[in-house]
C-alpha cells in the first residue's frame, strides 16, 4: 500500500518525507486556503520535496475550464496529478486528460457507481471519502470493498485512493479491504507506528542493557 500525505505544509511534508515512507501528497482548495500562499508556488515546492504523485485540484466547475486549469497545473512538474471533482463535467474533463496522458485523481466519491464511471473515464486514481461517509452513518469501508470488487471484475487500472482518513484504524481497514493508496493528515502518521507496549518494551530493554555495562560500538 502507498501512503500519501494530505497537506500543504511544506515543512511538515519535508520532515515526514525524510522517513522514506511517504509516496505522494494530496492537496485541496481548503488546504491551499489555509496555507495562505499562492497555489502554484505551493504545488511546485511540494513537487521538489516529494518525487511521487502530487495531487493539485482544479477550482473550475465546467469541463472546458477544468481542462484549461488542469493543463496549466500539469505543467508545474511531471509528477503533478490533476485532481477533479466527481461531477458530469469532471468526468468529461477526466476523459480528455486521459487522452492527453495527464494523470488524474477524481475526488469526492461517495458511491460505487461514481467510481465505475471514473474508471470508465480513465481516472488514474479514485478518491472515496471514508470519514465523511462515517460522519453520515455509513460504513466507508463498504464503499472501498464495492469499488475493489467492481474494478477487479472488469480489470480497471484506476487505483483506489482512500481519502478523508481520520485515524490509524481507517488505514488498517483500508489496507485490509484492498485500497491501493491511503492519504492521511500528518497527525495520523505517528499513530501508525506508536504503541504504548512498544514504548514499555523498549524502556525495559534499555534498562536491562544498561545494567550489563556493555557497548556495541
Swiss-Prot record:
GO terms for cellular component: cytoplasm. It comes from the Bacteria. One of its GO terms (biological process) is pentose-phosphate shunt. Pfam families: TAL_FSA (PF00923). It catalyses: D-sedoheptulose 7-phosphate + D-glyceraldehyde 3-phosphate = D-erythrose 4-phosphate + beta-D-fructose 6-phosphate. Its EC number is 2.2.1.2. The keyword Transferase applies. InterPro entries: Aldolase_TIM, TAL/FSA, Transaldolase_3B, Transaldolase_3B/F6P_aldolase, Transaldolase_AS, TSA/FSA_arc/bac. Keywords: Cytoplasm, Pentose shunt, Schiff base, Transferase. It is found in: Cytoplasm. The active site is at 83 (schiff-base intermediate with substrate). Transaldolase is important for the balance of metabolites in the pentose-phosphate pathway. Belongs to the transaldolase family. Type 3B subfamily. PANTHER family: FRUCTOSE-6-PHOSPHATE ALDOLASE 1-RELATED (PTHR10683:SF40), TRANSALDOLASE (PTHR10683). This is Probable transaldolase.
Amino acid at each position: 500500500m502507498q501512503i500519501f500525505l494530505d497537506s500543504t505544509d511544506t515543512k511538515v511534508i519535508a520532515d515526514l518525507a525524510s522517513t522514506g515512507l511517504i509516496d505522494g501528497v494530496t492537496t485541496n482548495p481548503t488546504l491551499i486556503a489555509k496555507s495562505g500562499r499562492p497555489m502554484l508556488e505551493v504545488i511546485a515546492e511540494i513537487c521538489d520535496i516529494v518525487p511521487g504523485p502530487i495531487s493539485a485540484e482544479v477550482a473550475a466547475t465546467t469541463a472546458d475550464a477544468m481542462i484549461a486549469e488542469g493543463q496549466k497545473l500539469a505543467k508545474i512538474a511531471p509528477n503533478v496529478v490533476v485532481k477533479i471533482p466527481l461531477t458530469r463535467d469532471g468526468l468529461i474533463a477526466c476523459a480528455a486528460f486521459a487522452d492527453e496522458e495527464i494523470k488524474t485523481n477524481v475526488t469526492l466519491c461517495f458511491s460505487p457507481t461514481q467510481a465505475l464511471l471514473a474508471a470508465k473515464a480513465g481516472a488514474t486514481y479514485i478518491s472515496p471519502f471514508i470519514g465523511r461517509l462515517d460522519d453520515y452513518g455509513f460504513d466507508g469501508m463498504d464503499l472501498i470493498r464495492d469499488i475493489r470488487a467492481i474494478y477487479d471484475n472488469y480489470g480497471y487500472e484506476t487505483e483506489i485512493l482512500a481519502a478523508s482518513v481520520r485515524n490509524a484504524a481507517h488505514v488498517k481497514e483500508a489496507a485490509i479491504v484492498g485500497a491501493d493508496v491511503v492519504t492521511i493528515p500528518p497527525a495520523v502518521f505517528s499513530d501508525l507506528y506508536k504503541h504504548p507496549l512498544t514504548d514499555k518494551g523498549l524502556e525495559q530493554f534499555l534498562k536491562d542493557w544498561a545494567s550489563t555495562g556493555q557497548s556495541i560500538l
